[in-house]
A protein has these predicted regions:
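Cofactor-binding loops of NAD(P)H-dependent oxidoreductases
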Residues: 48
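Hydrophobic/aromatic pocket-lining and membrane-interface residues
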Residues: 66, 86, 125
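Short, conserved SAM-binding segment of the class I
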Residues: 82-89
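Redox-cofactor binding/interface segments in oxidoreductases and associated redox assembly factors
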Residues: 65-69, 99
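Glycine-rich anion/phosphate-binding loops
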Residues: 76-82
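Oxidoreductase cofactor-interface core, primarily capturing Rossmann-like NAD(P)-dependent enzymes
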Residues: 1-34, 38-41, 51-54, 58-61, ...
Length: 148
C-alpha cells in the first residue's frame, strides 16, 4: 500500500485530504501537533519540527508522496524557510510528488506583497528538487460544505 504523508493533517484542509486519501485506499502518515485526531488504522500520527531537518526526514521516510499544507506566519521569511526545508526533505526522501495547495497568485510577481509571497513560498518548496504540483484554487470547496 502506498504511503502519503500529510503535513498539517489536523487542520481543515489536512483532514479533508486524509479522508479522501483513505477512501482512495492509501496509508496515511499524518503530521500533526494534535494527537488522537485520527482513529483509522491506516493513519499513523507523527510529529515533525520545521526547524529540525532530521524530524522532517523521519516524517517523510518511506513515503511515496506528500501533501504540504504550509503554516501561515506574519513573518514571511519563516514561511519561506519552512517551505525550503520541506522541499529539501522531500528530495532527500525521494518523494515521487509533493503537492501543495496555495492561495491564488498570478504566475509572475506583480509588486503586491500578498501575491508575491505566495510565489516566494512556492519557489522555496520547489528548489529542493522534488517533483512538485501547486494547486491555487480561488475558493476552498470544503469551506462550502462544512462549518468554518
Amino acid at each position: 500500500m502506498e504511503i502519503v504523508t500529510v503535513f498539517g493533517a489536523s487542520g481543515r484542509m489536512g483532514q479533508a485530504q486524509v479522508r479522501q486519501l483513505l477512501l482512495a485506499g492509501y496509508q496515511v502518515r499524518a503530521i500533526t501537533r494534535k494527537k488522537g485526531v485520527f482513529s483509522d488504522n491506516n493513519v499513523t500520527e507523527v510529529s515533525a519540527d520545521y526547524n529540525d531537518p532530521q524530524s522532517l526526514d523521519d516524517a517523510l521516510a518511506g513515503s511515496d508522496a506528500a501533501f504540504y499544507n504550509k503554516p501561515s506566519f506574519e513573518q514571511v521569511t519563516k514561511m519561506i524557510d519552512f517551505c525550503a526545508a520541506v522541499g529539501a526533505a522531500a528530495a532527500r526522501a525521494d518523494i515521487r510528488l509533493i503537492y501543495q495547495t496555495a492561495a491564488y497568485a498570478p504566475d509572475e510577481e506583480i509588486g503586491q506583497y500578498n501575491y508575491d509571497r505566495v510565489l516566494a513560498t512556492e519557489r522555496a518548496l520547489k528548489q529542493g528538487g522534488a517533483r512538485t504540483t501547486i494547486f491555487r484554487p480561488v475558493l476552498f470547496m470544503d469551506n462550502t460544505l462544512t462549518k468554518w
